[in-house]
Swiss-Prot record:
GO terms for biological process: chromatin looping; DNA repair; double-strand break repair via homologous recombination; regulation of telomere maintenance. GO terms for molecular function: ATPase inhibitor activity. Component of the Smc5-Smc6 complex which consists of KRE29, MMS21, NSE1, NSE3, NSE4, NSE5, SMC5 and SMC6. Interacts with NSE5. Residues 1-69 are annotated as: Disordered. It comes from the Eukaryota. It comes from Saccharomyces cerevisiae (strain ATCC 204508 / S288c) (Baker's yeast). The modification Phosphoserine is found at residues 81, 101. This is DNA repair protein KRE29.
Length: 464
């Protein structure tokens, strides 16, 4: 069998097929050049040539001899010497892997399995852009984390935060409501800036819906709230059998027995600042209708007073106040049954005089009670405008100095629009309030009420 001259300084000769058939060579002679054919895919061929012969690194005999025992040797070839093989043939038969395809899925399937789960890494020279301290810092953090995890805990006690306590109390209060998402508990308990989720809740339990619906189905005569006065002063028999007194009716509404007996907000227990326990309530207009059955002009003062306080506690409840079916026109019909002064006096027996949050809610229901409420609040029977304005400024300074900005916000909302502090740019009290709020807003404060007060006072000063 003939051999091929492998000297790099001589031209290569064309070798006939008969001379290389013993090698089972994949070389195919053509008129254009030699091609390498993959045995696994007859349709894919690759040119057999060196793109840059001058810069090729495999030119020395030492490099060629190092490849003799590698997988690059021709199968079936039994060389007697290093010159029996063409070095070009050794370098071209490098792999049995199929040629890459345009189809990515096909390429992944044809890739050897041992390479699929590996990502090729390359070294980049970032120069001055690479920060050597990053690797040392990461290593220190990993060592510190390992040390913390491996070290024994010195104190097994768990730190209990105020948010943890509030979340636990909220979970207990709403346990009857079924499964509550954890995200709801976090949103409600972590909102501590404005306390918008805390309010007065007269109804704190689920209503007795079936019993109330039974009363509703039996009720054919509407109370005077709905245009008929024939039921006024007389409790229907079917209602009296189920609810002998107003207290029994309130229990059906979902009011606990303690609140039914007191009909007063206990500020020591912070009943005016409780989370909503997501209890179900009966439709507001129907509750008012059933409550009206227990009013009578012939009743003694204690019974009428109990009725009025129950009514005030009910309409101030956040769930009742914000109910979609709540109609304040029904509340006006109840107010007509009492003198305004008597109504305001009963109101202040339930609500603290400094709770301007509920004062503002009451005025949203009964706007025309603003002057009567302010006179009663500042103990001015004669209601002189100059004296009440001085008391209002004094009250403002107290809230402002104590940084009680939430109450200060509702204090402003309660006062404005009355004849004591009217709207418009000519009110000197408004200018004083604006200067005080502007001074505190220039300081570093995170109280959201300050920003709201700035906008409100600017708005009130522009109303003519």
């Amino acid at each position: 069998m003939g051999s091929v001259n492998s000297s790099p300084n001589e031209e290569f000769e064309t070798v006939p097929d008969s001379q290389i058939s013993g090698f089972d060579s994949p070389l195919i002679p053509t008129s254009v050049g030699s091609y390498f054919r993959d045995d696994d895919d007859d349709e894919k061929v690759h040119p057999n040539f060196i793109s840059d012969p001058e810069n090729d690194s495999l030119n020395s005999d030492e490099e060629f001899s190092s490849l003799e025992n590698s997988d690059l040797n021709l199968s079936g070839a039994k060389a007697e010497s290093g010159d029996d093989f063409d070095p070009i043939l050794k370098r071209t038969i490098i792999s049995k892997r199929k040629a890459p395809s345009n189809n990515e899925d096909e390429e992944i399937v044809k890739t050897p399995r041992k390479l699929v789960n590996y990502v090729p890494l390359k070294i980049f020279n970032l120069g001055d852009s690479f920060d050597d301290t990053i690797t040392t810092t990461v290593a220190k953090l990993q060592d510190l984390k390992k040390e913390i995890l491996d070290s024994p805990r010195s104190n097994k006690s768990i730190v209990i935060t105020s948010n943890t306590v509030a979340k636990s109390e909220l979970q207990k209060s709403i346990k009857f409501s079924g499964s509550i998402p954890e995200i709801y508990l976090d949103v409600v308990t972590k909102e501590t800036i404005s306390d918008k989720y805390k309010d007065w809740h007269f109804i704190s339990k689920n209503c007795h819906y079936e019993q109330l619906m039974d009363l509703e189905m039996k009720d054919t005569a509407y109370s005077f709230l709905f245009g008929s006065s024939r039921s006024q002063g007389k409790v229907p028999e079917f209602v009296h059998l189920k609810c002998p007194s107003i207290t029994n009716l309130l229990v059906l509404f979902g009011v606990n027995q303690e609140k039914c007996n007191s009909l007063k907000i206990n500020y020591e227990k912070k009943e005016n600042s409780r989370y909503d326990n997501l209890c179900t309530i009966f439709p507001v207009n129907k509750m008012l209708k059933f409550l009206m059955y227990f009013y009578s002009d012939d009743d003694n003062d204690d019974v009428r007073e109990f009725f009025l306080k129950a009514f005030i506690c009910l309409i101030l409840d956040r769930k009742v106040f914000n109910a979609m079916e709540s109609d304040h026109r029904l509340c006006f019909k109840v107010l007509e049954l009492f003198n305004e002064a008597h109504f305001i006096n009963s109101y202040f027996e339930i609500v603290d005089k400094n709770d301007f949050f509920l004062h503002y809610r009451l005025l949203q229901i009964f706007p025309h009670l603003q002057s009567a409420l302010l006179r009663r609040r500042f103990s001015e029977k004669q209601g002189r405008t100059e004296t009440i304005q001085q008391n209002i400024i004094k009250e403002f300074n107290e809230f402002f100095d104590c940084k009680n900005y939430k109450n200060l916000l509702y204090f402003i909302l309660t006062m404005y629009g009355s004849k004591f502090i009217p709207f418009g740019p000519k009110c000197q009290v408004t200018e004083y309030f604006k200067d005080c709020i502007l001074d505190i807003s220039n300081e570093t404060t995170n109280d959201v009420e300050i920003s709201i007060l700035k906008g409100i006072l600017n708005l009130f000063s522009k109303i003519r």
